[in-house]
A protein has these predicted regions:
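PLD/PLD-like phosphodiesterase catalytic module centered on the HKD motif
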Residues: 1-37, 41-166
Length: 166
């Protein structure tokens, strides 16, 4: 706790493996109160796990103002590998958006998930499992928020809640 009895002091934990990284993502999702911003090259199959599905669904059900924004370089496998996430998109189309980066943003290589602009999981490169879990880090969160807003602006909708066809 801080000296004035407010919010807990910021904490950081080094992550050295994929399992630690995936567990850290679940930790940050569970801590979210208002918004989740996710950037990655592509989404791992963990986004189809029952645990992650429940965490995201509970977050979206907690308040109608809660939002999840996802930007990926490669969204093509989401329908195939993450049908639970696609179901969430259909159920919460007003609160969940999945975008694809435009070519000008494809050189961004460090995935991160940001919750409420203060807690995050940040990998240093998408080909490496090393990263950091930070809770209550306003400064680091604001830096990632600025980067996320730039990535979001350089992206277009990738998946729709509806299926169009003939």
């Amino acid at each position: 706790m801080d000296p004035e009895g407010g919010a807990p002091a910021p904490s950081q934990q080094r992550l050295d493996g994929v399992a630690e990284y995936e567990t850290a993502i679940d930790t940050v999702i569970a801590s979210a109160q208002r918004n989740l911003r996710i950037f990655d090259r592509s989404l791992s199959r963990e986004y189809n796990s029952p645990r992650r599905y429940d965490l995201l669904r509970d977050f979206l059900l907690a308040s109608r103002v809660n939002r999840v924004q996802i930007v990926v370089h490669e969204p093509d496998g989401i329908h195939r590998d993450c049908p639970r996430l696609v179901n969430l998109l259909k159920q919460f189309s007003h609160a969940l958006a999945i975008h694809r980066t435009q070519p000008r943003a494809r050189r961004v290589y460090d995935p991160f998930l940001l919750a409420d602009d203060v807690s995050y999981v940040h990998r240093f490169h998408y080909d490496q499992p090393r990263g950091v879990l930070a809770l209550g880090d306003l400064n680091g969160g604001q830096e990632l928020l600025g980067r996320y807003e730039e990535i979001w602006e350089a992206s277009d909708p990738a998946l729709s809640a509806t299926t169009l066809g003939l």
